[in-house]
């Protein structure tokens, strides 16, 4: 009986291999077969909203900051292979991940991330998109598409089964209709969340020693932006006057707030942010090579003050609550405004405080 059983096992193994090969073939070439999944099926309540910068508002985009009504997901209908180049720093890659996920779902495609993006984000978040093996990446007949930084109608009807996206998208107009799913993807690992909450639990207001009632995360972007903004983009970073006004905005609206300051320029913050009221804590470590500790702190706060940059955007987006941001931080003729649309960058309910552009006028004088 042994030869018969052995033969049966071999036949069963061959059958499994054949079925697996057929399944893989159908997944890769599913786009060649009629599946009839248009936008009317994916999102039957699809609405277009006219916007001054041609922003395409996706179905289910919530009007209030803490709700979400995503399009129905049809996991079984996903076909093809989409990915995105991982480029830039931590916040850039978060934007690329969220945009890839949203656009792939909208177009009925399977999204994959490349190993470099997985290495950047997986140690921090519970991300779920599968990783594309390098050998598959190198052999796939990609069409490449560079995205601009706001959702456009043409992005909702991309017919390419093998698409590699690029660019630095970080606009709520791509993914806000999936807000709860995005927040789930960017859930901190337990040890990072617990460490951040432990830091916040130890904070006390300086004058009274009382526990704070409200935690306001403050992210001050400095570093390379000190040169890039004025020299390349004719813009500024947040100064001490802006931060003082933003903090006063929260002091007027929230009882006993404490401001948890993080930055890649902590020395400047200690010298230029007024901490005399006892409600400012310089908590960030400013380590750009390992930014997740600062990021975790910011997301565990109730509200956010941001200056510029994708790191601050994502901290505010995940924290929820009120957000104050630096508005109009470039001159009107800046080339930056060709690639950056404020309406698409900042949620409508966020509060903007205009930047002081006088240093730029001084630089422009002969």
Swiss-Prot record:
Ranges in the topological domain labelled Lumenal: 26-366
Subcellular location: Golgi apparatus, Golgi stack membrane
Its EC number(s): 2.4.1.69, 2.4.1.344
Membrane topology (UniProt): Single-pass type II membrane protein
Catalyzed reaction equations: a beta-D-galactosyl-(1->4)-N-acetyl-beta-D-glucosaminyl derivative + GDP-beta-L-fucose = an alpha-L-Fuc-(1->2)-beta-D-Gal-(1->4)-beta-D-GlcNAc derivative + GDP + H(+); a ganglioside GA1 + GDP-beta-L-fucose = a ganglioside Fuc-GA1 + GDP + H(+); a beta-D-Gal-(1->3)-beta-D-GlcNAc-(1->3)-beta-D-Gal-(1->4)-beta-D-Glc-(1<->1')-Cer(d18:1(4E)) + GDP-beta-L-fucose = alpha-L-fucosyl-(1->2)- beta-D-galactosyl-(1->3)-N-acetyl-beta-D-glucosaminyl-(1->3)-beta-D-galactosyl-(1->4)-beta-D-glucosyl-(1<->1')-N-acylsphing-4-enine + GDP + H(+); a neolactoside nLc4Cer(d18:1(4E)) + GDP-beta-L-fucose = a neolactoside IV(2)-alpha-Fuc-nLc4Cer(d18:1(4E)) + GDP + H(+)
Pathway listed: Protein modification; protein glycosylation
Glycosylation sites: 66, 302, 328
CDD domains in the record: Fut1_Fut2_like
Molecular-function annotations in GO: alpha-(1,2)-fucosyltransferase activity; galactoside 2-alpha-L-fucosyltransferase activity
Entries under Pfam families matching the protein: Glyco_transf_11
Keyword terms, alphabetized: Glycoprotein, Glycosyltransferase, Golgi apparatus, Lipid metabolism, Membrane, Signal-anchor, Transferase, Transmembrane, Transmembrane helix
TM segment ranges: 9-25
Enzyme class: transferase
Cytoplasmic membrane side: 1-8
Primary localisation category: Golgi
Keyword Glycoprotein attached: yes
Function: Catalyzes the transfer of L-fucose, from a guanosine diphosphate-beta-L-fucose, to the terminal galactose residue of glycoconjugates through an alpha(1,2) linkage leading to H antigen synthesis that is an intermediate substrate in the synthesis of ABO blood group antigens. H antigen is essential for maturation of the glomerular layer of the main olfactory bulb, in cell migration and early cell-cell contacts during tumor associated angiogenesis. Preferentially fucosylates soluble lactose and to a lesser extent fucosylates glycolipids gangliosides GA1 and GM1a.
Assigned protein family: Belongs to the glycosyltransferase 11 family.
Annotated protein name in UniProt: Galactoside alpha-(1,2)-fucosyltransferase 1
Organism: Lagothrix lagotricha (Brown woolly monkey)
Gene name linked to the record: FUT1
């Amino acid at each position: 009986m042994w030869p018969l059983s052995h033969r049966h096992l071999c036949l069963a193994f061959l059958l499994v291999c054949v079925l697996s090969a057929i399944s893989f073939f159908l997944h890769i070439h599913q786009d060649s077969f009629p599946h009839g999944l248009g936008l009317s099926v994916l999102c039957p309540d699809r609405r277009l909203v006219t916007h001054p910068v041609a922003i395409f508002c996706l179905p289910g985009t919530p009007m209030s900051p803490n709700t979400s009504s995503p399009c129905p997901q049809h996991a079984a209908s996903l076909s093809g292979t989409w990915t995105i180049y991982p480029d830039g720093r931590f916040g850039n890659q978060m934007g690329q991940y969220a945009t890839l996920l949203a656009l792939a779902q909208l177009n009925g495609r399977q999204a994959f991330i490349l190993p470099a993006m997985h290495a950047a984000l997986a140690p921090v978040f519970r991300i779920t998109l599968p990783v594309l093996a390098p050998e598959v990446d190198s052999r796939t007949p990609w069409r490449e598409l560079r995205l601009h930084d706001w959702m456009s109608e043409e992005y909702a009807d991309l017919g390419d089964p093998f698409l590699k996206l690029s660019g630095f998208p970080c606009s709520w107009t791509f993914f806000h209709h999936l807000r709860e799913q995005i927040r789930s993807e960017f859930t901190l690992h337990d040890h990072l969340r617990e460490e951040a909450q432990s830091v916040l639990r130890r904070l006390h207001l300086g004058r009274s020693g009382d526990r704070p009632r409200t935690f306001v995360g403050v992210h001050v972007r400095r570093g390379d932006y000190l040169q890039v903004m004025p020299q390349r983009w004719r813009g500024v970073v947040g100064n001490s006057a802006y931060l003082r006004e933003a903090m006063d905005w929260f002091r007027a609206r929230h009882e006993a707030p404490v401001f948890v300051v993080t930055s890649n320029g902590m020395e400047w913050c200690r010298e230029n942010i007024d901490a005399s009221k006892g409600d400012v804590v310089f908590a960030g470590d400013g380590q750009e090579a390992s930014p997740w500790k600062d990021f975790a702190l910011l997301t565990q706060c109730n509200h956010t003050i941001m200056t510029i940059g994708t790191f601050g955007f994502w901290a505010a987006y995940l924290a929820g609550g009120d957000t104050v941001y630096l508005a109009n931080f470039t001159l009107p003729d800046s080339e930056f405004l060709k690639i950056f649309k404020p309406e698409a960058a900042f949620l409508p309910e966020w509060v903007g405080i205009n930047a002081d552009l006088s240093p730029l006028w001084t630089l422009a004088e002969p």
